[in-house]
């Protein structure tokens, strides 16, 4: 890194951390702690201004770290897509973090930076109030073992109906009946004439839409609303109806697998936490987002 920043890498396995550190030309300090090691986590947080966490599933490994960050006035950033867990963080820590001036910023990976920041800049580029933003996503890549574990682990949790709430992460009283009526999750295939393409359900929409709606609600509290009764929706982008159909069927099959008795059997054949796509797959991966405002 060319920036004048003192940084370190942390994890539970010193030898693996040393292998990672060899990839950097600068001296990188190595810090060792497990997600359940309160003493080790306190040592890391007490010495850090910001902690960036990539260790999921976060509902298993992230809660103690967030609490210790706040205790030590340390900002926290992660890549979770687990909105039910983020909801718990908001309920437990939002007021105290705000009082201390500490930033707790979940969902800073593929979910949900493109959606959240893309919507922000799309709206701001018009320099006027906006009623609605629709985003359309296409991508190429493979999931890591941690992401796969997160998806399959949710079947063991009693999440209830709240997980389907389009405004799960919003502050209480921050949305209207009109907004709620126009914000239901999308499961159908539709022709998008403005794009000369087709849209269908997007695998990350359930996570991303909640984050975008919360961001807009928090901006509204600062008198920086996107627009009166603003709504946001998200779709997968497809060039043809047949591709939209195949993708939607695949997504439906995945959903059925995650709630079926066979999920543990299927899980055993897939990547484990700590495993990921090959370097070739990573280097050839991409995503594209289009915004209709």
Question: Model-derived features: where do they sit?
Answer:
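Conserved glycine-rich Rossmann-like NAD(P)H-binding loop of the short-chain dehydrogenase/reductase
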Residues: 3-16
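Short, conserved SAM-binding/catalytic segment
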Residues: 20-28
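Conserved Rossmann-fold cofactor-binding substructure of NAD(P)-dependent oxidoreductases
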Residues: 29-61
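ADP-ribose/adenylate-binding Rossmann-like module
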Residues: 57, 66-87
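Rossmann-fold NAD(P)-binding glycine/threonine-rich loop
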Residues: 80-102
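Adenosine-phosphate binding glycine-rich loop
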Residues: 96, 100-140
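C-terminal catalytic/substrate-binding lobe primarily of soluble NAD(P)-dependent oxidoreductases
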Residues: 124-293
């Amino acid at each position: 890194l060319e920036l004048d920043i003192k940084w370190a890498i942390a994890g539970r396995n010193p030898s693996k951390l040393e292998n990672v550190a060899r990839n950097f030309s600068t001296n990188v300090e190595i810090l060792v702690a497990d997600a359940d090691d309160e003493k080790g986590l306190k040592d890391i947080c007490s010495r850090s201004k910001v902690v960036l966490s990539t260790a999921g599933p976060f509902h298993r490994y992230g809660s103690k770290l967030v609490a210790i960050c706040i205790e030590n006035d340390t900002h926290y950033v992660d890549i979770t897509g687990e909105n039910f867990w983020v909801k718990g963080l908001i309920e437990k820590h939002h007021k105290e973090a705000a009082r201390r001036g500490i930033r707790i910023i979940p969902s800073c990976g593929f979910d949900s930076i493109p959606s959240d920041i893309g919507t922000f800049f799309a709206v701001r580029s018009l320099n006027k109030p906006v009623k609605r933003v629709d985003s359309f996503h296409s991508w190429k890549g493979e999931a890591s073992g941690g992401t796969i574990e997160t998806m399959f682990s949710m079947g063991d949790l009693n999440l209830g109906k709240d997980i389907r709430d389009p405004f799960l992460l919003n502050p209480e009283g921050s949305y209207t009946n009109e907004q709620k009526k126009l914000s239901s999750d999308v499961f159908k295939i539709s022709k998008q004439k403005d794009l000369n393409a087709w849209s269908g359900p997007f695998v990350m929409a359930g996570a991303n839409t909640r984050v975008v709606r919360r961001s807009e609600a928090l901006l509204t509290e600062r008198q920086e609303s996107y627009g009166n009764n603003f709504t946001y929706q998200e779709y997968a982008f497809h060039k043809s109806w047949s591709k939209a159909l195949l993708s939607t069927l695949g997504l439906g099959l995945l959903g059925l697998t995650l709630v079926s008795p066979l999920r543990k059997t299927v899980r055993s054949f897939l990547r484990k936490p700590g495993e990921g796509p090959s370097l070739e797959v990573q280097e050839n991966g991409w995503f594209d987002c289009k915004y209709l405002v």
